UniProtKB/Swiss-Prot annotation:
Belongs to the ThiG family. One of its GO terms (cellular component) is cytoplasm. GO terms for molecular function: thiazole synthase activity. It comes from Chlorobium chlorochromatii (strain CaD3). This is Thiazole synthase. 1-deoxy-D-xylulose 5-phosphate binds at residues 159, 185-186, 207-208. The lineage of its organism: Bacteria, Pseudomonadati, Chlorobiota, Chlorobiia, Chlorobiales. PANTHER family: THIAZOLE SYNTHASE (PTHR34266:SF2).
Length: 256
């Protein structure tokens, strides 16, 4: 499989893992290893060296060939996200930042205005900015134009497991983008990850579907294989759909 390029970084895996929701750090690390992921996202609030049970930075730092992508989950304004991003960079040393601003805890939809404002500042501050957004083609293009390293439109609401309910808008974003498009949120099954990759997504980010599975490491491996299969299918080129049946064999008998 070809590499995923974000800024000057290259990753052989196109599966990005979230680190929330796992029952403990041991299961999380097993899932990351099983997935083969080389880019994982972690919330700033999990950089807690004073309380070991809440700290994910220590365990994640021990993983080889894994790059951290801090996120600003919990921020409800651009100012909060900008502050969180700078603290996260100081703690992790990572240039990546996933801008995640959702002021309403009920539906957790990303705020487009605050996200755009935060992204502008953070791009100028030298971050590789990866904003989490609704599947809005206009916003995605504007974020690309100001220098974001990728866009991360949602497949459906965070943690909902509703799959690719934004399918039609995702297709537009993919078609119009010249930066990586990473589907983030809502995926429930490996088949949905494969579908996203078949559409032409650059990568998928998965957390709940793996962390809440009966066997997270096994599910992580299943998602990894699905992402590879979907990418290969996209590169091979899917057949065109038809509104009618198309015969694959002659419809006349021999000698007729």
């Amino acid at each position: 499989m070809d590499s995923l390029h974000i800024g000057s970084y290259s990753f052989s895996s196109r599966l990005i893992l979230g680190t929330g929701k796992f029952s403990n750090s041991k299961v999380m690390l097993e899932a990351i290893r099983a997935s083969g992921s080389q880019l994982v996202t972690v919330a700033l609030r999990r950089f807690n060296r004073e309380q070991a049970e809440d700290d994910l930075f220590g365990p994640l730092s021990a993983l080889e060939a894994v790059t951290l992508m801090p996120n600003t989950s919990g921020a409800s304004t651009a100012a909060e996200a900008i502050r969180a991003a700078h603290i996260a960079r100081q703690l992790s040393g990572s240039p990546f930042i996933k801008v995640e601003i959702h002021p309403n805890p009920q539906h957790l939809m990303p705020d487009p205005i605050e996200t755009f404002e935060a992204a502008k500042v953070l791009v100028n501050d030298g971050f590789l900015v990866m904003p989490y957004i609704a599947a809005d083609p206009v916003l995605a293009k504007r974020l690309e134009e100001i220098g974001c390293a990728s866009v991360m439109p949602l497949g459906s609401a965070i943690g909902s497991g509703q799959g690719l309910s934004t399918f039609e808008m995702l297709k537009i974003i993919i078609r119009e983008s010249t930066i990586p498009v990473i589907v983030d949120a809502g995926l429930r099954s490996p088949s949905e990850a494969a579908h996203a990759m078949e559409m032409g997504c650059s990568a998928v980010l998965v957390n709940s579907a793996i962390a809440a599975a009966g066997n997270p490491p096994a599910m992580a491996e299943a998602f990894s294989e699905a992402v590879i299969a979907g990418r290969k299918a996209f590169q091979a080129g899917l057949m065109e759909q038809s509104g009618e049946a198309v015969a694959t064999s002659p419809l006349t008998f021999l000698g007729a």
